[in-house]
């Protein structure tokens, strides 16, 4: 199948001798991608590892994972099984399983120095995503479907088969005489994607829908390029984890572009895991235009007027609770922590406002002098232990020697200007 090589060449960004990982469930799509991508990597003197996540949701899942491993071992492909051993929620199981799957895959890739995780989303998956979002009232960004590349923390998710029909993958496996597994949830009418799949779609209809999704993708690329120019002129970010925004610009640009800008800022500052609902962002934009003197909230952020601008800061009530310092963690999906040379057990990381509220109980009689707005103090990260506050780095306060403390760096999981939407 030449389509994979063409797609990966268009995506680019691989090493001369690429090391890639592929998420493989044992279904026809992921098996076909694994075999094809392994050949692609080998032709370039690179290497591929296949990763199967056993969610432990069905009694037969462990046996299925072993079967996949045997198939791939027979082809000389390295394979690892990653187990989701956490307690399972009573509701939202599909969403929880998806989150766990990507977390386990990302952790393996990062720990093994692999920068590229490939998944087997194909043309019909893209069409289903488009139809689901259309029914939900999505705008252009949502109707563009899935990007061919998505940034994750420490790696990128690559979907090289988005233009390839599922039938082509079945035909490839048949030619290879490669068996595959079937996931019963793909036919369960309780799930919206399964209901869409039950509606037969001829090739002409599928090709037309896929072309339409690509058109939306190109529109999204153009909008993102314009948005990046606006963000560069209207928004400044601070390493303490907040943004300052020029409100005058909101009234001068297209309302939809303004809403996309506000959503991008909120995702960056608040660290939300999923895109924001369009109607909520629209209400925020309208509110900021009508009553700019009022503070507002969205997606774990507060939009607060301050000296002719508005600041976007973390909403304390939506923040992660204080937690023990762990090297390499990304606390509250916002602050990266590096360990000190000497372990310091008992240290807790949180925001100042999550600890005692008086200056003396925090560890200083008077708040340190700082150019930062006072309204920001409650959502500044701090280290706490015995006998109280140990450090508030962004205020320049350190009870212990700074070099002996963990380092806290703002590292938003959602960049303000992430890699652009990719259409191949």
Regions from the PLM with identified roles:
Residues 78, 160, 167, 207, ...:
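Proline-centered helix-kink/hinge sites
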Residues 4-6, 11-29, 47-49, 84-86, ...:
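AMP-forming adenylation/ATP pyrophosphatase catalytic core
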Residues 57-58, 94-95, 158-159, 186, ...:
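A generic secondary-structure micro-motif detector
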Residues 15, 46, 112, 141, ...:
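Structured loop/turn residues at beta-strand edges in well-structured enzyme cores
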Residues 57-62, 187-190, 293, 315:
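Acidic, metal-coordinating catalytic cores used for nucleic-acid/nucleotide bond scission
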Residues 90-93, 192-194, 358-361:
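Short, solvent-exposed polar/charged micro-motifs at secondary-structure junctions
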Residues 1-133, 163, 167-168, 174, ...:
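ATP-dependent adenylation/nucleotidyltransferase module used to activate substrates
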Residues 115-116, 122-280:
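Flexible helical/loop "lid" subdomain adjacent to adenine-nucleotide binding pockets
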């Amino acid at each position: 199948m030449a389509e994979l090589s063409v797609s990966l060449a268009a995506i680019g960004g691989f090493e001369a001798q690429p090391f890639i990982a592929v998420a493989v469930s044992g279904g026809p799509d992921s098996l076909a991608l694994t075999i094809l991508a392994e050949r692609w990597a080998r032709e370039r003197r690179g290497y591929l590892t296949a990763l199967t996540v056993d969610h432990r949701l069905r009694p037969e899942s462990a046996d299925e994972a072993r079967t996949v491993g045997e198939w791939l071992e027979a082809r000389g492909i390295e394979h690892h099984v990653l187990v989701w051993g956490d307690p399972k929620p009573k509701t939202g199981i599909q969403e929880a399983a998806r989150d766990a799957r990507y977390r386990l895959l990302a952790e393996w890739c990062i720990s093994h120095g692999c920068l590229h995780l490939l998944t087997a989303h194909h043309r019909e998956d893209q069409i289903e995503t488009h139809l689901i979002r259309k029914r939900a009232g999505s705008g252009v960004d949502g109707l563009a479907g899935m990007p061919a590349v998505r940034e994750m923390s420490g790696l990128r998710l690559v979907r090289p088969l988005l233009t390839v029909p599922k039938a082509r993958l079945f035909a490839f496996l048949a030619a290879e005489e490669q068996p595959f597994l079937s996931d019963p949830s793909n036919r369960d009418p309780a799930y919206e994607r399964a209901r869409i799949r039950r509606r037969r779609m001829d090739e002409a209809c599928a090709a037309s829908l896929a072309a339409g999704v690509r058109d939306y993708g190109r529109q999204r690329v153009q909008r993102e390029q314009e948005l990046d120019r606006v963000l560069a002129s209207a928004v400044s970010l601070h390493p303490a984890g907040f943004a300052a925004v020029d409100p005058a610009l909101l009234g001068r640009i297209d309302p939809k572009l303004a809403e996309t800008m506000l959503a991008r800022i909120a995702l960056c500052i608040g660290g939300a895991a999923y895109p924001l609902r369009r109607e909520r962002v629209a209400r925020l934009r309208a509110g900021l235009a009508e009553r700019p003197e009022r503070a507002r909230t969205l997606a774990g952020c507060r939009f607060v007027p301050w000296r002719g601008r508005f600041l976007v800061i973390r909403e304390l009530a939506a923040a992660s609770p204080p937690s023990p310092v762990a090297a390499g963690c990304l606390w509250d999906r916002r602050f990266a922590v590096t360990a000190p040379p000497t372990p310091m057990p008992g240290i807790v990381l949180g925001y100042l406002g999550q600890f005692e509220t008086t200056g003396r109980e925090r560890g200083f009689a008077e708040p340190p002098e700082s150019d930062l707005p006072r309204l920001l103090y409650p959502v500044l990260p701090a280290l706490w232990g015995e006998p109280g506050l140990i450090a508030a780095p962004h205020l320049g306060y350190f009870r212990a020697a700074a070099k002996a403390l963990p380092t806290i760096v703002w590292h938003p999981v959602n960049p303000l200007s992430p890699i652009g939407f990719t259409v191949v």
